């Protein structure tokens, strides 16, 4: 498995740390069958990608094996935001038959934290996410990880998060503070 490097900013706000710990605990209380979680928001720029990333990292630091999947195939910000280096294939490569599952999962510098990025923009992201190939991906990673955190597009913009949600065990709606 390939390893990526990235800029991992330290979480300095105790309120964010406490919120992530509460979310992590609440997910654990949902039961062992709740493993694949969609993270979305109602509109862009509410912080869902940051919460998805920070939650995944926090859970991994707590001893869980976590896969974070960037499924925002239209407007992904993850790779650029965290300056991720060493990635050559993403989810869209797998969904279009250009890569195998093992080619799109990367180990991070945090033990237990694995990552799949969105990959290049596709002409029809909705069809890719509503495909048998995406179902196969979810079925495979569900068995291999303690939790799969899927960063989905905002609900109020495109239908993709609803489609992704049908393959998941639960959803978290992130809203901007204030």
Show where each model-derived region lies:
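Primarily NTPase-proximal linker/entry elements flanking Walker-type ATP/GTP-binding cores
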Residues: 30-36, 57, 61
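Hydrophobic anchor at the start of a short beta-strand
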Residues: 66, 148, 171
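Alpha-helix C-terminal capping segments
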Residues: 58-62, 163-167
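Conserved Switch II/interswitch segment of TRAFAC-class P-loop GTPases
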Residues: 152-157, 168-178
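Hydrophobic positions on the alpha1 helix immediately C-terminal to the Walker A/P-loop
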Residues: 50-51, 55, 160
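Active-site signature of alpha/beta-hydrolase-fold catalytic machinery across serine-
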Residues: 54, 58, 81
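Conserved beta-strand segments of the P-loop GTPase G domain that flank and frequently precede/overlap
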Residues: 38-40, 117-118, 150-151, 173-176
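P-loop/Walker-type NTP enzyme "switch/lid" segment
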Residues: 2-17, 21, 25-26, 30-32, ...
């Amino acid at each position: 498995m390939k390893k990526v490097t990235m800029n991992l900013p330290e979480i300095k706000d105790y309120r964010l740390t406490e919120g992530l710990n509460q979310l992590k605990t609440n997910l654990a209380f949902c039961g062992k069958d709740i493993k694949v979680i969609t993270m979305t928001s109602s509109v862009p720029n509410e912080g869902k990608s940051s919460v998805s990333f920070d939650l995944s990292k926090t859970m991994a630091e707590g001893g869980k094996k976590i896969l974070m999947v960037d499924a925002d195939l239209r407007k992904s910000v993850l790779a650029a935001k965290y300056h991720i280096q060493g990635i050559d294939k993403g989810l869209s490569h797998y969904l279009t038959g250009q890569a195998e599952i093992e080619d799109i999962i990367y180990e991070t510098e945090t033990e237990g934290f694995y990552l799949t990025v969105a990959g290049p923009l596709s002409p029809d992201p909705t069809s890719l996410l509503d495909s048998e190939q995406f179902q196969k991906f979810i079925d495979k990673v569900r068995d291999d990880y303690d939790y799969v955190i899927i960063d989905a597009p905002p609900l109020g913009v495109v239908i993709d998060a609803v489609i992704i949600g049908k393959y998941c065990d639960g959803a978290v709606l992130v809203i901007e503070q204030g």
